[in-house]
Amino acid sequence: MASVLPAAPAAEKKRLLPSFDRCAWVALAALVLVFVGQYFAFGYHICPDTRKYIAFSPRVNFLYPWFLAALRGVFGEESYLSWCAIVQNVFLAWSVFSLCEYLRRQLDLSNAGYLGVTFTAGACFLLQLVFTGNHILASNVIFSEGLAYPLYILLIKYTFAAWRYPSLKNALLAALFSFLLIGARGQLSWTLLVVLALGIRAMRAASRSRAVSVAAGAALAAAVFLLCSALNTASNAYKHGFGQNATMGRSVVLATAIWCSEPEDAALFPEDSPERGFLEDVNAFIDKEGCAARCAPEGLIDRFYYFTDLYDTLKDSLSTFMLEYTPLENATAFSVRIALRLAAHRPLSLLRHTSMNFLAGAVRSVAIFSPAFIVLAAVFYLVTLVTALVCRKKGVLVLESRLMLAALLLTLLNCWFVSLGVFALSRYMFYSLPLLYLAAEILFIRLLLLLFKKKPAET
């Protein structure tokens, strides 16, 4: 399936836009027909977060609300949500095609290999219809992942390009997609680390000193972060009359710290302070709803699902309690103060919680979170990691092993970042799944072909 063709010319490999031949047109047409076709079969879906994006909630990042507003302006109130799902499905089809076509040229895939990896990438998304709890494809849902998934796939493509062919242009393109991703999903702020690494690599390739390269990479990552923050603030100022960054990040960090706390931790703050009053009210709410780690069962699986069931109950209550003790413009500083104090006081509880969340995220990046799949996921990660490292050490399948290691590293970063705040919801972890399976398919089929090719020569 992933057999090798004669190497493409160097200029063709460096080309970022897709090259079209009959096979490429077939792949693109098939992806568009499948994704758009399933939309017409199932229609679009409204989820609990949809109203936040439509209403320009100050809690969410700027990109998706403005995307919906633009579609509403073009297609009208009656049909813009339908067109939103259509656009998301076409964009997803294009992003899958663009990545697979790029890998085709980089890895010199045969037509069969190219169509095989395209099928694998597309099938990973279609499996959402079977394995997610609501049996809905994300590109049909009116929420930010409808844009973020294809943007992430394109970030992978440009990251691979910027690492293999380091240049300022390629680093800037990767930074652009990181900016768009963070603009859609604050959870993906960890991609700033990718921007930092690519900026450093581009500068080192241009024979800059290590210090200059690090400074330039840091400046590029900082520029992406500051631009996202500025646009979030400007969007809230325009829509709500007050300029502040998206508040979702503040909410999840505080909710995690409180989830891991104990009732007596309110005494960490002076008796008449607003922080203490806030925590006492929240603890009374927790006693009623049971939404804290101290109320959770002990078993790993049960404990995780208890967290996922009640985390939003705690998080969504915090803003209501907070506004009784501090004005909205001071809410961020108020939240950070409490979160840092609680986290510093309960480091082991926080470590236990984030470790559980990390494990669940790692499993959900490749499978369903259950006892059997924990073992299978561990085997998958171990086998792919060892195989990629051995291939790299022996100097065989270097690009294939590099792709596999990159997939594992990006998964690690996503799991780590999610574990610190929001829980490892399936849709937060799905970003890594298509790349992991795509990279594993290419690596192991190429390895098998290499082994079978060597056998006749040895006998």
Language-model segments: what does each one mean?
Residues 37-71, 75-79, 244-245, 331, ...:
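Extracytoplasmic catalytic/substrate-binding loops of multi-pass membrane glycan-assembly enzymes
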Residues 44-48, 52-54, 218-319:
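Juxtamembrane membrane-water interface segments immediately following transmembrane helices
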Residues 86-111, 150-158:
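Transmembrane-helix motifs of polytopic, lipid-linked glycan transferases
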Residues 87, 127-159, 180-191, 428-433:
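Multi-pass, polyprenyl lipid-linked donor-dependent membrane glycosyltransferases
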Residues 274-388:
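Lumenal/periplasmic acceptor-binding loop at the mouth of the active site in multi-pass
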